[in-house]
């Protein structure tokens, strides 16, 4: 209870958590832009067609869209011809208005059709795992793979003072002589991890609620390949499963970063060094390395990003030569499991070293010294028994002048014990 009060109140941990959630929400609302602006701009027209073809691309929906494309193309051509005829005086104004009304009915949902037709062309490339759906909500929630700087800064502010505050006022010397030093460090670890998890889960739920209200998150059981960002993915997961898995990876990445910061603070024992090392371990790879390299490093950063663990190969094409270049190579499941296992091992090792560095040194030495007297007593007992056994065997060699004494000694050894 004391450690909770110390971290959350005296070190302003609770204030940082609330501030992160508040700023994170404000930043989310202010910076969000729809991935497909036309889908939002012509939402009603798009939904009119989506209701007819929603879900798996069947032969019927494909035929319907192709026929609709021909019908709209003919209407556009007829509209242009009608306008020219009117200006040339070939038709009257009444005839022009009458024909224009009929053409207008065909072109009523034209803008929405262009959006659905582009989605249709994407779906046809691999109809088995690409479905028709509103993509802006899910793309905003899953796509992008960018670092949440608000959460990152919140973790830095929450974790850094936990041990550095004790080193700054030289409380570490007192803790090392206390019986509760190791227990106190364990409580700090658990409290910090709980606070970090609270921030991550809250931000994840806020994002889900925001995109659900603004765009909608329908059809969570559709394949993740329905989003163009995951077009080349070989992972057989749904949209909602992708949200859960990415969220779990980000949770682990946040915990990994928190443990790394505490480990650095125990080694460096200074605020500035801990903050700088924590920032460098995330910012430098994020800015200076390609995603292909980042997602293969046992660092917190790839897990904080999370998204591209489920993306396929991303290829860019040169506009002049037509040559293709792989910008990002897909992370296979085995690679992900190996990277995760190594990272978990590093977390456990760092946590163990943190606990050991804050354990009572005198008690650790005393435990080793307690074994010395025990071994000495056992050794003395063994030597005594060995010595007595030798005396019993040497009776036959005692001179005759000492015969009474030897008999007395023999009688003593024959007595029941």
Please place each PLM-identified region on the residue numbering.
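Internal alpha-helical transmembrane segments
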Residues: 1-34, 183
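Central hydrophobic cores of alpha-helical transmembrane segments
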Residues: 17-20, 272-285, 303-304
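Long, solvent-exposed extracytoplasmic domains/loops
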Residues: 52-128
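Short helix-to-coil transition segments within interhelical loops
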Residues: 176-182
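C-terminal motif of bacterial Sec signal peptides marking the signal peptidase cleavage site
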Residues: 385-387
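Short, low-complexity, disordered segments immediately C-terminal to signal peptides
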Residues: 390-403
